[in-house]
Every structure is written in structure tokens, then in C-alpha cells.
Amino acid sequence: MSILQKLENSAAAAVKALYGTDPMEGQIQLQKTKREFKGHLTLVVFPFVKMSRKSPEATATEIGEWLLANESAVSAIEVVKGFLNLTIAPRVWLELLNEIRADINFGHKVATEDSPLVMVEYSSPNTNKPLHLGHVRNNLLGYSLSEIMKANGYRVVKTNIVNDRGIHICKSMLAWQKWGDGVTPEKAGKKGDHLIGDFYVLFDKHYKAELNSLMAEGKSKEEAEAASTLMAEAREMLRLWEAGDEKVVDLWRTMNQWVYDGFEATYKMMGVDFDKIYYESETYLVGKEEVLRGLEEGLFVKHSDGSVWADLTKDGLDEKLLLRADGTSVYMTQDIGTAKMRFNDYPINRMIYVVGNEQNYHFQVLSILLDRLGFEFGKGLVHFSYGMVELPEGKMKSREGTVVDADDLMDEMIRTAAEIAAEAGKAAEKDEEESREVARIVGLGSLKYFILKVDPRKNMTFNPKESIDFNGNTGSFVQYTYARIRSLMRRAEAAGYDIPSQLPTDLPLSEKEEALIQKVSEYAEVVSEAGRSYSPALIANYIYDLVKEYNQFYHDFSVLKEEDERIRAFRLALSEVVALTMRKGFALLGIEMPERM
């Protein structure tokens, strides 16, 4: 039982003993005491004033005196208006530290075969371009959320839906046919996803030139788009693909495999993975079947041009296209099919889609359509909506070829980390292989932390220069502190200093040492809240606060030079627990920790 739970129970007992009634649910409000006051935890007394029929100050004093007499964990009280500040006895903090040290899974719940199953979908790339900065935020959020849900005792299936078909894919294919001259990734000397992305940009370049030419002849933009022969060829290629044309399908398979190979290398570098990958080319037909079933059952309507729509006006929305006039499907068709396949494949208790907030409407509609089609899981979908990410220069647009590729960004982060280490003279202390590995860990850690520390629901600007800074709220600052603690522990081991498995509980503690133990003990609740609110940012910022707390302690107190063996062992044990908590928390963010920097 945590100190918080213990004192909540004792506070409830105090209210019952003093006022003859049990407090209602939510009336016991314990919070961390503000720094300007004495104490560790503060009880809000206002809810009990009616029961006591006394002033808030008198009520707080009564409850505080009862706790002093009946709860050994409380060593002192301070009343500030309607707030009761409680000081926890040093013995209790030391007992808690022993409990945390003895529990290797502290803060994490272990799933069993009976635990609820959560599926988390993230990444969802198109096979016409490499992953970019927007995908980086998506992948990092999805992977971290999956790890956080695991730490909350859920079984988790990490899944990806690859958008490997559609008009955007045909644009790259057509451009390669027209202007590719048989080039392959090997011939070009570049990753397949980057090569295909080049052809997507090339298509757009020729398409814009064609539109400009048609508009120069007097056509409006809409008329020019309708008259475009290039776009007509792309649409015909899509029709042939859906009809199973052998040549088109063979080209599609070849070019997609180039992209898959490129994606796999990017995912590996990023440190994310998936338990199950679905492909739109396999799921859209299931979706079409469901749409046609809905049409037969009168759930959907067919317009005069042959297109199929869902009328959502009774749900406060508009009409939604499900099949185009030529019979080809849209994203919604695919998502209906994918959802059906997933719930057939796994006994899912919760389905979480990690998709940007520009798709809020899409998932609102998907939930309604699945429910209308008779799927019970329709109302249980969770859209983990996150904000857009930009660079200081502005938004990214893949059609213009100005997008920041994930590969280039990760390479730049690693290179910058290596340069900073070289300038600081750190590289000379390690061999070349270790220096490269540390640069990789620090560079990628800085990238991940900078993105994940931001509330996922907010738009953000990623500044590469700011992200690698050994001061302030950055991943490299946390990693440096971790490496320093690991160095401390190595030196302690070399000196032969022993740390007993159970620390004595009669040691004197300073306020900063108590505060540090209290901060470590909060890890479990932070992990729990991060799972409830789907927020890796809570983990990131908690770890940063823990690091600041530790650095204050390290600055003010001797560890290795402490002459009292018992106090030295305590401070080493506390340092070790802080490092372990940092590592566990960063693992939930997908960030590695370097043993040396």
C-alpha cells in the first residue's frame, strides 16, 4: 500500500471517529504539499466543515491531532487555513525505499492471459513516399502508448495499416513508367521508399505543368483538372489494378516491395515495431463487401451516377461517400474492412487509432458506420487524436518535395550528437564503435524526448537545435544524468562499497532526501495516469522533474565521500533507484539510456 493510500484510509478513519460519518467518495483529497509550506502531503479540509460545524482551521487541527495520535506515519502537522499539511516520518520514507528496491516491477503491472487486450494502430504510411517528420510523431506516440498500456497491465497488439493502393500509389507508378527508364533502388543507390517518393514528386511536377498549360488556353482550374490526360491515365491505372490487370499488378508489387524494404530500415533505426501489419490491398475488398451489404439492407443509398453514400444527417453530420461512381473505394471503405478483420483476428477489448487530429471527423463517421452495420465494437473505438508537427521553417508538403524525411532527420540528429561529443572532448574517452553507439542513443533519444514531452493533443514545432541541449528539458540532459549515476555506481563498486538489500530505517533524512524518495514513489501513479489519459508527455515530464530533484540532491550532499557507511549506502541505494526509475520511464518512451557519455 502506498503512503497516499495509507493516509487516505487514515483520514477517512479520522473523519468517521471525529464526526460519526464516513466521508463520501472523492471527499478525501490528498495532494503534494506546495514547496513554500512544511510537509509532504496536504489534506483539503473544506469538504468536512459541515460535518464538524467548525471553522476550516479548527477542523484541520482536529483531524491533524487525531492523525498524530493514531497514525504513526505522520510525524508533524501544520494548518494553513483550510489545508492540513502532513509531515511523514523518516522511517516511513526509508521503509518505502526498501519496498521499491525489492520490487523490480515497481510502477508496472504485469499482464496475464486474462488481461484485457488492447490493439494500438500507428504509423499507417502510404507506399508512395518515405516516412516524414509527421510519421515520426505518429510512430513515437503509438509505440510509447503501447508500452504504457503494457505497463498498466494490458495485453497489447501493435498494428500498422499500410496504405498500399489508391490513386496516390498509381501516380508514382505512372511516373516511373513514363520517366523512370527502368531505374531500381540498386541502380539509383538509394532506399526504395525515397526513390518512389521522387517519382511521386515528379508526377506532381508534370501534372502542375499540364494544368498551367491548359489554363493558359483559357480553361478554369476546375476545367483543366477535368481535362488532364495525366490524371486520367493515373485513374485508369487504378481501375486496371482493381480489375487485376497482370502487368499493372506486377509493377505494383515490385515498387511496393522497394518501399517496404525502405520502411523496415526506417522502423529499425527508429526503434519501433509491430505485431501485425495489415495492408489496404487486403482489407478494402472486405470493406466493399460490407458497403454492398449495407446497400442491400437499405442502410446506404446509391446515387444516379452509381456512387454509394451513407446519409448521416440524422447523426448531425452530412452524407459520406463510400464507393465512387466507377466502383472504386475510398479510405472509409478500407477502414470498415480493416476493423472487421481485426476484430475477427483478435479478441480485442479496446481499439486505439493513433491518427492526427485532422481525421477527427473520419473516425466519428467510422464509429457510426460500424455501429449501423451491426458491429458491437463500433462504439468502442478510441481515436487518439494528436496535433500536427512542424519545423521552424513551416509546414511540410510531400507533393512539393520539401518534406523532411524521417531518415534524414534521424541521421542529422545522430551526426549532431557526435559533433557535440567531439567538441566536448568526450569522443576521445571512448573507442570509435562506442562513440558511434552513444551518438546514436543520444541523437535519437533527443529527437524522441523533444516530441514526446509535448502534450500529444497540441500542435508543436520541432527544433533540432534545441532538442540536443545538455541543459533544460531535453532527452540528452536526462541521459547525461543517468550516465553520471551509472559512473557513480561503478566507482562505488570499484571502491568495494556495499549496499545492503534492506536499508536501516532509523537513519536521519534531510528534506531533500525525503523529497527525492517521494518523487520516486510517484512513478506508479504517473504511469497509471499516463495510461488513463493516453499521454506519454506525463512520463517524459515526470522523469525530467525527477532528474532535477536528483541533481539538487547530488549537488548538496556527498555520496562517495560520505564518511558514515550507513548514510553512504543509503545515498548510493537512492541513486541506484533513481537511475532505474529513469531507465524504466524512458523505456516507456522508446528511449535507450547510455551507460557512459
Curated annotation (Swiss-Prot):
Give the reaction(s) catalysed: tRNA(Arg) + L-arginine + ATP = L-arginyl-tRNA(Arg) + AMP + diphosphate
Q: Which Gene3D superfamilies match?
A: Arginyl tRNA synthetase N-terminal domain (3.30.1360.70), HUPs (3.40.50.620), Isoleucyl-tRNA Synthetase, Domain 1 (1.10.730.10)
Give the motif span ('HIGH' region).
125-135
Query: What EC number(s) does this enzyme carry?
Result: 6.1.1.19
GO BP annotations of the record are: arginyl-tRNA aminoacylation
Q: Which domain of life is it from?
A: Bacteria
Instruction: List, alphabetically, the InterPro entries matched.
Output: aa-tRNA-synth_I_CS, Arg-tRNA-ligase, Arg-tRNA-synth_N, Arg-tRNA-synth_N_sf, ArgRS_core, DALR_anticod-bd, Rossmann-like_a/b/a_fold, tRNAsynth_Ia_anticodon-bd
Key words, A-Z? Aminoacyl-tRNA synthetase, ATP-binding, Cytoplasm, Ligase, Nucleotide-binding, Protein biosynthesis
The answer, when asked if Disulfide bond is one of the entry's keywords, is: no
| Single annotated GO MF | ATP binding
Q: Name one GO cellular component term.
A: cytoplasm
Provide the assembly information: Monomer.
Family of the protein in this entry: Belongs to the class-I aminoacyl-tRNA synthetase family.
Name recorded for this polypeptide: Arginine--tRNA ligase
User: What is the native source organism of this protein?
Assistant: Porphyromonas gingivalis (strain ATCC 33277 / DSM 20709 / CIP 103683 / JCM 12257 / NCTC 11834 / 2561)
